């Protein structure tokens, strides 16, 4: 009996064990994709989290315009800005605004959606909606520049900080323009599971989302598989997928931080469909610490949305993550007091949260940790945001390099200024002081006095122990003087130092490209050096670097080096009998670049692969074919397709289509007249990319008719097409062959059509460039735009106006070698040899070893002496 019982128990255990094992072993197929289920499904099990989420900034990120959601006063209110009086009113249940439209005239528009809840609320108008669009699709939404200040309860006009004049309807910055389009610029971060769905052919949006605001699945990922597992009878989560949501709480902080970075970063998209927990670098390219967006020491200047700052911080490198300070569901900080910091910095009593450390009276603003270590900058007129680089105040860097510091910022109200400057700065914040100080010597002197006062007190309190060498010095020096060799050497050291934050190292790599002497040295090595000396410091670092942001920076400078080598074939007279560049002499130096780029095309991060593929296109096709085997060329085609997909994911932007055309154009094999020299397969491939490039430029003109670039590029390609027609016409025997005569006549008709189009393209481009140049001059930025306008004027025969515009460009960017070169050449054209000689000398200061610049300078000297 006992034996039977034992056998029965054993059998039951075996069956039970088998069931348990089977239950554990079963898994969701790897190919199965989770779907979005919505917050109502999540609430069933996660009510506590839902309660915290309700009413949060994520919950209020976007909504329909209703009596419950609209905070502004639409009771027949008016607001005037730059000569335009707008009126806010109701039409039954609809919220309406009468304001300037894309044609420059006043129109009534319905406000359909609201954006945000505090400290401001914005409002959106829908354009281009057709009657046949499904209810769940949204057409083009434009964000009004008229906003509601929720604290002061008033309307205000939101103006870009660097634009002082009225924004015209043709400007992309106008509220009806591209930069204020919700579908392109806002939607991805204000809604869940956004599908942009832009129809390039019809120029229409069919945008959808699963939830209108930033809901649960925006961070945790689509939840259908999680729900399936939670509601199943299984005793286990999935052995491969766990609980089938993004793993945001693991020991590695990367997944959580990069999930937040998707929206809290200054970045560009390279593909759609990011889900929480995925790699940021497979979907986005993060902006480095550029001169336009960050101060030289890495403090925030423009709107950069946290991530780039946090990557610089010691907190990030010590494993701190977003939810250590912020509640992930309410989005609020966990404490409004210094406990937010001291809950981790639990040092002996009296070390930090005491006057012995902060040197301020108890209860004053200066006693708060965040005031010194996370100073605020106000954006969008009323929205103060804290710098997340969490740094020690460094007034010594302010004294040396003009960077901000928390001490001067807090004590700016103690400044002593004459009445004129006081009036100029009324209502301005610290960032405005720093900007105005560059133009106003009185303001600059007062800021320097305050910085020196702050530095004196910091040294008195804490000594100089914390004032260690900082990358601000290096960035400031190379940006002030591109020929500073010592700064260049320090940049090299910085890139190789793994103790330096990766975003700083990546920025250093980009800054190396400023150093004109280093670029010239690359050229000299390519044409004059021995093989063992051919590898540049950038290339050496690129061969061993693993961090995506550092690689991106290195690739930018590597592209400059490759392009400089290729372009220098003309300067060194490396041409063949047809007058085309002969690249045989640069095969060896380019070999190192090609091998490195091919390796990077297998990188795990998409952003690295496509950037390597893009830079690879700078290598001439003939050199590519010589250095790569068929397998490597095939691999490049795969990654090239990834690159094209990435660019096309932003096809609603004229700049993306302009880039697409340039990418296709780089794949055109040879100059078109020498078509007989190319085999049929290569000719067809070249023709395909030639046609694709022209179509991309045409699309760019359709999408962004008020933006420059595409017309000029298309006109240049038309010139190539005309060369092809001329070449084909020369081969025809018109006198003796009737068919040839017919072909000739057909080509003449084609020529006429292309010539007429090209003339119009250049005329329109000149007008658009003129508008852009005027905006750039008014904003005191954009010397490159003014330079391009000047070149277009020259092509149009307006030499005097070209000289005038180049003189302006020189004022905006006195150390830009290309602008200095153009100005020198136009002065020579105008026979102003003495002035031209001065700028030729300036050019040789910037690029000392360039043989063509030396020859130009000598020629100018001869003409002056005649």
Description of each model-found segment:
Residues 484-495, 517-542, 564-600, 622-644, ...:
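Amphipathic alpha-helical scaffolding segments comprising HEAT/armadillo-like alpha-solenoid repeats
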Residues 499-501, 531, 545-547, 604-605, ...:
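Short inter-helical turns and helix N-cap capping residues of alpha-solenoid HEAT/ARM repeat scaffolds
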Residues 651, 705, 779-781, 814, ...:
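Short coil turns that delineate tetratricopeptide repeat
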Residues 22-26, 48-116, 120-129, 143-145, ...:
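Primarily the internal scaffold of c-type cytochrome electron-transfer domains
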Residues 560, 618, 666, 720-723, ...:
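Register position in tetratricopeptide repeats
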């Amino acid at each position: 009996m006992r034996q039977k019982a034992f056998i029965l128990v054993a059998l039951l255990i075996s069956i039970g064990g088998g069931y348990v094992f089977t239950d554990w072993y079963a898994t969701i197929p790897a190919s199965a994709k989770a779907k979005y289920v919505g917050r109502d499904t999540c609430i069933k099990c996660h009510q506590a989290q839902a309660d915290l989420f309700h009413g949060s900034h994520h919950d209020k990120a976007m909504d329909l315009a209703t009596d419950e959601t609209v905070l502004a006063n639409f009771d027949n209110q008016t607001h005037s800005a730059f000569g335009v009086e707008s009126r806010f009113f109701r039409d039954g249940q609809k919220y309406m605004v009468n304001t300037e439209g894309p044609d420059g005239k006043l129109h009534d528009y319905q406000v359909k959606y609201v954006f945000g809840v505090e400290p401001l609320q914005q409002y959106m108008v829908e354009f281009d909606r057709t009657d046949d669009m499904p209810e769940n699709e949204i057409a083009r939404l434009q964000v009004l520049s008229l906003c509601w200040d929720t604290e002061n309860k008033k309307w205000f006009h939101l103006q870009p900080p660097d634009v002082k004049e009225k924004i015209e309807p043709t400007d992309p910055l106008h509220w009806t323009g591209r930069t204020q389009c919700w579908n392109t610029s806002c939607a991805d971060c204000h809604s869940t599971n956004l599908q942009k769905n832009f129809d390039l052919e019809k120029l229409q949006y069919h945008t959808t989302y699963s939830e209108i605001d930033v809901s649960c699945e925006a961070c945790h990922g689509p939840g259908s598989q999680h729900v399936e597992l939670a509601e199943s009878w299984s005793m286990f989560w999935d052995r491969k997928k766990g609980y089938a949501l993004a793993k945001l709480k693991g020991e590695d902080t990367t997944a959580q931080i990069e999930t937040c970075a998707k929206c809290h970063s200054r970045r560009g998209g390279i593909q759609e469909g990011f889900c929480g927990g995925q790699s940021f670098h497979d979907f986005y390219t993060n902006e480095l610490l550029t001169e336009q967006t960050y101060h030289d020491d890495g403090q925030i200047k423009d709107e950069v949305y946290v991530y780039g700052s946090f990557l610089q911080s010691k907190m990030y490198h010590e494993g701190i993550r977003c939810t250590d300070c912020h509640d992930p569901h309410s989005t609020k900080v966990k404490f409004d007091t210094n406990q937010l910091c001291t809950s981790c910095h639990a040092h002996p009593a009296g070390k930090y949260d005491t006057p012995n450390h902060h040197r301020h009276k108890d209860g004053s603003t200066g006693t708060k940790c965040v005031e010194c270590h996370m100073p605020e900058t106000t954006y969008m007129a009323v929205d103060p945001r804290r710098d997340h680089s969490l740094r020690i105040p460094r007034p010594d860097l302010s004294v040396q390099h003009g960077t901000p510091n928390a001490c001067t910022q807090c004590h700016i109200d103690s400044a002593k200024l004459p009445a004129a400057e006081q009036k100029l700065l009324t209502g301005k914040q610290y960032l405005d002081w720093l900007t105005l100080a560059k133009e106003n010597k009185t303001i600059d002197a007062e800021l320097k006095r305050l910085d020196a006062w702050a530095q004196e007190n910091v040294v008195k309190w804490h000594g100089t122990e914390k004032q260690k060498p900082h990358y601000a010095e290096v960035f400031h020096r190379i940006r002030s003087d591109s020929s500073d060799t010592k700064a260049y050497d320090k940049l090299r050291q910085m890139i190789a130092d793994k103790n330096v934050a990766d975003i700083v190292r990546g920025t250093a790599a980009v800054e190396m490209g400023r150093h004109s002497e280093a670029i010239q040295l690359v050229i000299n090595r390519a044409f004059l050096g021995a093989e063992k000396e051919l590898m540049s410091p950038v290339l050496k670092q690129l061969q061993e670097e693993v961090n995506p942001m550092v690689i991106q920076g290195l690739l930018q400078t590597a592209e400059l080096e490759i392009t400089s080598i290729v372009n220098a074939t003309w300067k060194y007279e490396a041409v063949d009998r047809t007058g085309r560049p002969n690249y045989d002499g640069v095969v060896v130096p380019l070999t190192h670049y090609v091998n490195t780029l091919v390796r990077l095309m297998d990188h795990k991060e998409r952003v690295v692969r496509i950037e390597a593929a893009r830079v690879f296109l700078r290598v001439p096709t003939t050199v590519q074919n010589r250095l790569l085997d068929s397998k490597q060329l095939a691999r490049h085609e795969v990654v090239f397709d990834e690159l094209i997909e990435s660019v096309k994911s932003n096809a609603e932007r004229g700049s993306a289509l302009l880039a697409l055309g340039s990418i296709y154009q780089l794949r055109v094999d040879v100059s078109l007249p020498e078509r007989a020299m190319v085999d049929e397969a290569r000719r067809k491939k070249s023709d395909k990319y030639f046609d694709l490039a022209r179509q991309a430029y045409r699309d760019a003109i359709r999408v962004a008719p008020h933006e420059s670039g595409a017309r000029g590029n298309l006109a240049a390609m038309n010139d190539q097409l005309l060369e092809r027609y001329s070449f084909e016409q020369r081969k025809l025997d018109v006198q003796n062959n009737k068919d040839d005569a017919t072909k000739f006549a057909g080509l003449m008709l084609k020529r006429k059509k292309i010539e007429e189009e090209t003339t119009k393209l250049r005329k329109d481009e000149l007008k658009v460039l003129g508008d852009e140049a005027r905006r750039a001059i008014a904003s005191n930025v954009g010397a490159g735009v003014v330079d391009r306008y000047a070149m277009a004027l020259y092509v149009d025969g307006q030499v005097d106006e070209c000289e005038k515009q180049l003189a302006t460009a020189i004022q905006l960017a006195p150390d830009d070698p290309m602008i200095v070169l153009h100005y020198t050449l136009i002065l020579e054209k105008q026979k102003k040899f003495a002035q031209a000689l001065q700028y030729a000398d300036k050019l040789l200061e910037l690029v000392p070893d360039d043989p063509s610049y030396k020859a130009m300078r000598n020629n100018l000297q001869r003409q002056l002496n005649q």
